[in-house]
Regions:
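Carbohydrate-interacting regions of secretory-pathway proteins
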Residues: 1-167
């Protein structure tokens, strides 16, 4: 909503771990995660801002097939990403970090091992400037545009938490 973090909560655990927790344990862990969220995330000037430390932020809503728009910018040496349905991730990073392979650009499905993981092209704007993702997820298939350039075209997102199961 651009004013506060209504609709958001702290990341507790991957989907498989969450299912195994008792209601009481899940509630306790959620309270801890929400406290960490409040320490490191804030709504400011219509944007969600992260301190660069702490845990992930997740929506309270559940989505099936979806399209989303995300405006983002990253700092020098930054490394981040967007989890889709709790699975990592559409990669965001400083492309000058060649020692970790970041020269391939942002937008790839970084944790894919069997299939396509790198972007089709580098479409990142310079560090410290705004970039825009359009992400579509239909079933386990992901398409990503970065700054209106197609970087991932209908690729299956692999299940990072259990490589033998689909998303």
């Amino acid at each position: 909503n651009g004013v506060d973090l209504t609709g958001w909560q702290g990341w507790v655990a991957d989907p498989y771990t969450l299912k195994k927790l008792s209601a009481q344990e899940k509630k306790m862990r959620q309270e801890e995660a929400d406290e960490k969220m409040r320490q490191h995330w804030q709504a400011k000037d219509g944007k969600i801002v992260f301190s660069g430390e702490g845990a992930n932020l997740v929506t309270k809503r559940t989505f099936e097939d979806f399209e989303m728009h995300v405006d983002w910018k990253i700092t020098k040496d930054g490394d981040s990403g967007i989890y889709l349905r709790g699975y990592p991730q559409v990669q965001i990073w400083d492309t000058s970090r060649v020692e970790v392979g970041a020269q391939v650009g942002s937008g790839g499905l970084y944790n894919n091992q069997k299939g396509f993981s790198t972007p089709l092209t580098v479409a990142d704007r310079p560090v410290g400037t705004w970039n825009h993702f359009f992400i579509r997820m239909l079933g386990d298939r992901v398409t990503v545009y970065l700054n209106d350039v197609l970087v991932v075209n209908d690729v299956a997102l692999e299940n990072y938490w259990d490589r033998n199961l689909p998303v």
